């Protein structure tokens, strides 16, 4: 009874692996990437450039663009893009159009993102959430919709970099909210453009050492948030809460942040070059072994574990 089942599972796994390894022929197709100043975007731009793709890399800052151009080949071109600015998006789209011409755009990688304030939700304002959503959710949506005609022209691919925290909201602030939103947009888009030959993949990295996870920046941002709180709210939590919270955050980040960004880049490259790209990729050991399994557990259990890990406010009622 069990032997046929086991053989069936092994056969399915073998066929899946064979299918997953099938690649498209080598290509010099055009790939547009956002957020190439540093981190995942910069690494991917350089790796695709080395593989012969014609990379159109957008950066937020002139220094980021100049630094990338300096170490890349002549095939790679850079432009400036602020994904929160509709006018900047329109200018970038025109720039892309002049490069791709009749060939269209084969790949769009929405990588630009920010962390915002990572901390208790009651400390934050609507504007705090808005700033993160503008970059992490509305930005990719705006860029994707603007470039969609060029992607349809080439029967191309959209790869949205979300986060494993788009599957499990482990902390307060706009980051998790923004990534959940981008996940939903990606799922809807995938179904809507599939009839036209456009493929959509989601890459949900675990914790990696990038500017988004820079501890000094995260701590400075949270301390500034604490400093602006009304005295009544500060009294509710107590002075010791912030110190303990930052200590826990530091311990977790030092323990699980992976310095090997190539794990993410390999997933992005597979999504662009595989004949059958996956719907979702989850690079990082913490994504596979911690966050994704936890996302399927009962909410009460996850809440209890997080309550045990994080410090309690001074005036807690339990």
Swiss-Prot record:
Position of the signal peptide: none
Pfam families reported for this sequence: adh_short
Pathway the protein acts in: Cofactor metabolism; retinol metabolism
Activity regulation, free text: Inhibited by 9-cis-, 13-cis- and all-trans-retinoic acids, with the most potent inhibitor being 13-cis-retinoic acid. Weakly inhibited by oleic acid.
Keywords, in A-Z order: Endoplasmic reticulum, Lipid metabolism, Membrane, Microsome, NAD, Oxidoreductase, Sensory transduction, Steroid metabolism, Transmembrane, Transmembrane helix, Vision
Any one of the GO CC terms: endoplasmic reticulum membrane
Enzyme Commission code: 1.1.1.209, 1.1.1.315, 1.1.1.53
Record topological domains on the Lumenal side: 24-288
Entry protein name: Retinol dehydrogenase 5
Species per Swiss-Prot/TrEMBL record: Bos taurus (Bovine)
């Amino acid at each position: 009874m069990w032997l046929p089942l086991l053989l069936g599972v092994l056969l399915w796994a073998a066929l899946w692996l064979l299918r997953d390894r099938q690649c498209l022929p080598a290509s010099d197709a055009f790939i547009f990437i956002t957020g190439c100043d540093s981190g995942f975007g910069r690494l991917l731009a350089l790796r695709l450039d080395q593989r012969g793709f014609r990379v159109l890399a957008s950066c937020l800052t002139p220094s980021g663009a100049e630094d990338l151009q300096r170490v890349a080949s002549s095939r790679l071109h850079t432009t400036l893009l602020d994904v929160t600015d509709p006018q900047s998006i329109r200018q970038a789209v025109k720039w892309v159009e002049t490069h791709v011409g009749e060939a269209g755009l084969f790949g769009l990688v929405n990588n630009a993102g920010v962390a915002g304030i990572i901390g208790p939700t009651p400390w934050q304002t609507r504007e705090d959430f808005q700033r993160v959503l503008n970059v992490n959710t509305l930005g990719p949506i705006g860029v994707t919709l603007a470039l969609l005609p060029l992607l349809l022209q080439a029967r191309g691919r959209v790869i949205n970099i979300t986060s494993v925290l788009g599957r499990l909201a482990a902390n307060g602030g706009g980051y998790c909210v923004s990534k959940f939103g981008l996940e939903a947009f990606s799922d809807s888009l995938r179904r809507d453009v599939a009839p036209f030959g456009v493929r959509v993949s989601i890459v949900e990295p675990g914790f990696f050492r990038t500017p988004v996870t820079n501890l000094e920046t995260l701590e400075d941002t949270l301390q500034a948030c604490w400093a602006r709180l009304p005295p009544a709210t500060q009294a509710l939590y107590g002075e010791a809460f912030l110190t303990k919270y930052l200590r826990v955050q530091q311990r977790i980040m030092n323990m699980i942040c992976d310095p090997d960004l190539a794990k993410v880049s390999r997933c992005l490259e597979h999504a662009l070059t595989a004949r059958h790209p996956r719907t979702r990729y989850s690079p990082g050991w913490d994504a596979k072994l911690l966050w994704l399994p936890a996302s399927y557990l009962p909410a009460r259990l996850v809440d209890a574990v997080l309550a045990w890990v994080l410090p309690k406010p001074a005036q807690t009622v339990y």
